[in-house]
Amino acid sequence: MQVHVGRIGKPHGIRGEVTVEVLTDTPQERFSAGAVFSTEPTSAGPLTVETARWNKDILLLGFEEVNDRNRAETLRGTRLIFETDSVASDESESDSWYEHELIGLEARVGDQTVGKVSALNPMPAQDLLVITTAAGEEVLVPFVAEIVPEVDIAAGFIRLVPPGGLFDINRKDAE
């Protein structure tokens, strides 16, 4: 199973280090020296972590395959994918899900389907679900129990209790 754990940002320095947007709860485990990542696009990898360090709140990685800033620049935007056989929802954590489990679920308000989950954006305060409506509009929904009280992976839906105006805030015809 493949799990998206990070996205490469801009180069840092001249020796090929890059900044990484961390998309995992366990960066110390995932980004340790020797870890091997598949990449998207596949032409960028695989990449093997040589060094991992934090500069303030930013993760800096050095890869064995990257030894200068020019090569590091070509990796900007590359997704880092961790391959594992042991990724499954932990039964003891009934309120934890992986992004791949949520994408494609119907988003319902009451019994009405208002869209589908198209992405999960990890943020410092709380994660945001990206709901794509039938009209193709994207709505960002805070992934908190008060707004998303029910997630039923087996049945293929999430239930929303959105605050007033959440689905209208970005509509072009709402003015």
UniProtKB/Swiss-Prot annotation:
NCBIfam families, sorted: 16S_RimM
Domain remarks: The PRC barrel domain binds ribosomal protein uS19.
InterPro entries linked to this entry: PRC_barrel-like_sf, PRC_RimM, RimM, RimM_N, RimM_N_sf, Transl_B-barrel_sf
Keyword set, alphabetical order: Chaperone, Cytoplasm, Ribosome biogenesis, rRNA processing
Protein name: Ribosome maturation factor RimM
Gene3D superfamilies: PRC-barrel domain, RimM
Entry superkingdom: Bacteria
UniProt entry tagged with the keyword Chaperone: yes
GO molecular function: ribosome binding
HAMAP family on file: Ribosome_mat_RimM
Species of origin: Renibacterium salmoninarum (strain ATCC 33209 / DSM 20767 / JCM 11484 / NBRC 15589 / NCIMB 2235)
GO biological process entries: ribosomal small subunit biogenesis; rRNA processing
Domain PRC barrel: 94-166
Protein family (similarity comment): Belongs to the RimM family.
One Pfam family it belongs to: PRC_RimM
Known partners and oligomeric status: Binds ribosomal protein uS19.
Cellular component terms per the entry's GO annotation: cytoplasm; ribosome
Keyword Transcription regulation attributed: no
SUPFAM superfamilies: PRC-barrel domain, Translation proteins
Function description: An accessory protein needed during the final step in the assembly of 30S ribosomal subunit, possibly for assembly of the head region. Essential for efficient processing of 16S rRNA. May be needed both before and after RbfA during the maturation of 16S rRNA. It has affinity for free ribosomal 30S subunits but not for 70S ribosomes.
Subcellular location: Cytoplasm
